[in-house]
Design a protein with these regions (language model features):
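Short linear recognition/processing motifs and adjacent strand/loop elements at protein termini
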Residues: 1-158
Length: 158
């Protein structure tokens, strides 16, 4: 059973797994909610691990870029900020960037209008979700492969 609310709480304090390398980002549509998924490369030393260090909350005003402090513009009337411990670049010698999309503009979702990746700053990934209506959401951390899922209600009634 999962709790729907307006703040995920701060998951950074109790980290067990990760950080993981971002592999993909995508959106999905369900009957009562829109879904945003961050998928990470599995960690062979922790095969059942999942991203457990995150903080998701409604932005108070215009979201700001972690590194520069510049405003981040998204489509929608409200912004939901997603911070998760993770890497945007491999930790190999060549430091290859993640192949995940930088921006998503779903067309079938009811409330979620856009997702923009601000990048990685000091091992923290920052995404901003532009939504039409400020509603309840839930956050799920799922293993195999490691994923962080943000489900945003389609309307305030559910």
């Amino acid at each position: 059973k999962f709790h729907w609310g307006t703040d995920s709480g701060d998951g950074f304090e109790n980290s067990i797994y990760g950080p993981y390398l971002l592999n993909d980002a995508r959106t999905g549509v369900h009957a009562d909610y829109d879904r945003f998924v961050l998928e990470f490369e599995p960690d062979i030393s922790e095969p059942d691990g999942s991203p457990d260090s995150f903080h998701v909350f409604w932005a108070d005003g215009t979201p700001l870029s972690m590194g520069s402090g510049n405003p981040i513009s998204v489509t929608g009337n409200n912004a939901l900020e997603v911070f998760v411990l993770g890497y945007g670049y491999s930790r190999d010698e060549l430091a290859e960037p993640s192949q995940a999309p930088q921006s998503l503009s779903p067309t079938r979702t009811g409330n979620l209008k856009q997702a923009v990746w601000d990048g990685e700053f000091e091992g923290v990934l920052h995404w901003v979700l532009g939504v039409k209506e400020k509603v309840d959401f839930r956050v799920l951390s799922i293993p195999n492969p490691p994923r962080l899922v943000v489900d945003v209600c389609r309307t305030s009634s559910g």
